[in-house]
Amino acid sequence: MAWLAADADFNPDQLGLNVIGIASEIARHDSGEHAHKMGQLLFTNSGSIRITLSGQLCILPPAHIAWIPPDTTHRAEMSQVTGYRSVYINTVQYPILPKEVKVLQVSSLLKEILERIAFADFDTDWSKRPFLDLLNVGLNEIETASSVSVILQFPTDRRLRKFLGTELLPHLNVFADLVGLSEKTIGRIFLRETGLNYQQWRQQWRFLKAIELLSKNEKISVISHHLGFSCESAFIAFFKRMSGKSPRMLIKKDQS
């Protein structure tokens, strides 16, 4: 295990191990764009992690795990994060892990296993019992865990990309005037390149931004105004519809 400072550089590929765990209490950190030969599981007890991938945005909520396959270029930005843990795994040795980026719900059992791996010594022999048993249970838990829709695909059309950033896009008719394309053309581009129509994409962006702001302990009144809702109750209803949970449940989970 390596207990890392927020500004520390760490390259798991240099160690030549099959399983590596690290832990940190990171308040704020930006990994920069990078990739590694090992797959990576990352999670946090509180706060969210913004993960930027090639053409995709992922917001990792607290008490969830993100799986990033080997050789996947990504950038992880953390704000107000505590209890950061990362587990690197050689997928040649353990091919059961997913081939694509996933965000998964974490059972109490899986969380405890990942915690133990994150704090294990680097020289732990994961090919021998009892460590092998622990690792196998963890891998089985990952295989059966439910995935969460917190990854947003961005359109690649250059006419649209320059308008897609950190702020909520306007309604379709306003955006069409801004871009200089018809509403139908924009709708076709979004559906073809993201799998979502414009309104669905806009709502998913809102949802991810809401998770990020909730994880920073922003007030619901502030979030609902920032995301263009008419009132708090409208935002709460939206969040429940998107996640099946109320915003306060996420906050409670974050602080537990």
Each language-model region and where it sits:
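Short beta-strand segments in beta-sandwich/barrel cores
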Residues: S31, S46-T52, I65-A66, H74
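Ligand-binding loop in jelly-roll beta-barrel domains
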Residues: T72-V101
